[in-house]
Amino acid sequence: MAFDVARLRALYPALQSGTVYLDGAAGTQSPSSVIDAIADAYRRGTSNGGGFFDSSVRADYDTVAARDAVADLVNGDPRGVVLGPNMTTLTYRFAQALSETWRSGENLVVSRLDHDANVRPWVQWAQRAGVEVRWADIDLATGELPSEQYRELVDGRTRLVAVTAASNVLGSRPDVRAISDIAHSANALMYVDGVHSTAHGVVDIEALGADFYVTSAYKWDGPHVGCLIASPELLETLHSHKLASSANDVPDRFEWGTPSFHNFAGVAAAVDHLAALDDAATGTRRERLVTSLLAAERHEMALFKRLLAALEADPRVILYGKAAHRTATVYFRVSGFSPDDVSRELAAQDINVWSGHNYAWEVTAALGIRDTGSAVRASLAHYSNDDDVDRFLAAVQSL
């Protein structure tokens, strides 16, 4: 393996400033290759797709290239990749489409571990459709989402199960495959939020059993583009509320309005960058992604082990969540300080962390901290290094 974090960090202009970016769960920094791809798309001239002239042909090329890249990233079918402004918008779009197939007396299952973007769209459209919403609860001691509870929650009237592949605050990774097996045994669809998880390991939507998988490129070094991946056959069954003049093919029928073609160039560049995190990776782009993301996960978790051990040793620190299987993300409070105070003090030392609920609305309510500022989140990325961890720990200890 050749995962060289020093080599990697040199590729990111933002990392040259000296700032410690422990806010990867909110959005990652972009390497020069992604920035250049987007800038080049502007420089060569921009157009809508579907035309016969060069800039329009290039816009179509960038769209296809982005779909191909996202499909490689998650082991999906490029014909089923829907590109949009963000995961929240796409989820609302598909909640509307799916709700038109629901009937009174049916139900769907959401979880209290999820980001609100994989909760509220389903709850709101279920209410409009007269469909029951059932809740999967977290284990408050560990921050895990026990999969066995789904055997009681899912029945023959369940139409959809929405669950995260990793909590954006606790880092907990549910057993998505076990949950999907239960859902599919009742012929329910699985909608998996991969926004937080995608950057932190290898994704295989087939292995997960995800009928729909959503992710956002800005969480893995790319621009602000949301991605939904499903089988094209499943997409064909869904109605899209769109302009009469818009394409009716899939995935195009779900891509409303004029797309961000220049950002699509950045999506493909970001996936190519991820495939080269380990510069010894060989084979197809998918094979290089697997090698590189495994190496990146090992790197992140080695750093995180040291960071977490130091926080656990500090008697002033209160930690939330201790899942056995997790991402390199920690959610904590420091006795005597509000979460905002901690975040503000670290910002003064040029260390970026987030305080607050981070849209984990149900998680923070279940933990009993939502009304008191929630907690502080520190999240590592593949470009994090020992110095980042050292400076973070020193700053916390200085409080």
Listing of model-derived features with the role each one plays in the protein:
Residues 1-399:
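Pyridoxal 5′-phosphate
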